[in-house]
Amino acid sequence: MGSEERTIQTLGIIGAGRLGTVLARLAASAGYQVIVAGSGAPALIAPAMRAIGASAGTISMIAAEADAVILALPLGRYRMLPAEQLHGAVVIDAMNYWWGSDGIRDDLSDPRTSTSELVQAHLVGARVIKALSHMGYQDLEDEARPVGSAGRKAIAIAGDDPVDVALVAALVNDLGFDPVMAGPLSAGIMLEPGAEAFGADVDEAQLREMLERFPTSQRGIIVARARGELPL
């Protein structure tokens, strides 16, 4: 998996729900080859994927053929992802913790770590980047705009490797949004439920302001205290 030129030509999406389908449609419209894997046999989603310019496949196919992989499945299922197959892959974590679908999970709501760091710990050897997670799927579909368009909305990105972050930023730009760097992977907690940026459908300047306000927000203080960065 991967490309020596460090560009994405084939994009894999694991998860064929609303978010995965919207991202597949946007990526296909932007000229990417898109492979989507659902929870069942590829034949079950093949007609729907063909209709939006994507193809249906398996996780194994995605691992073998895609230059980057988006995770668009319920977060509670992340341990089911095949770490060995995704070793070395650029993995874009678009998942969030929802107690309604994931159940009550203390491990997924611990302020000491972002959920993307949990995904990275499971996917040993993968290159995990947090992105495409804080905006709702309906807004993603409705708000995508060409570069330079007035009122273009922004998507935040958190990751540890500058090259991988740049790769994902280019993808976000192609999908129709201005990329905003949030910081290292641990900063992905600023994009999770409970943070101001979660659910944000705003432009680049507004999103940057939200991220800058996080340390002094109620959620930011809880996180800082849990991480030992502020006294209890």
Q: What are the residue ranges of the model-derived segments?
A:
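Rossmann-like NAD(P)-binding element
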Residues: 53-103
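Rossmann-fold NAD(P)-binding glycine/threonine-rich loop
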Residues: 95-146
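Active-site-lining helix/loop region of Rossmann-like oxidoreductase modules
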Residues: 150-232
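General beta-strand structural signal in soluble alpha/beta enzymes
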Residues: 56, 127-131, 180-182
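Short, conserved loop/helix-junction motifs that constitute active-site signature segments
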Residues: 83-88, 122-124, 147-149
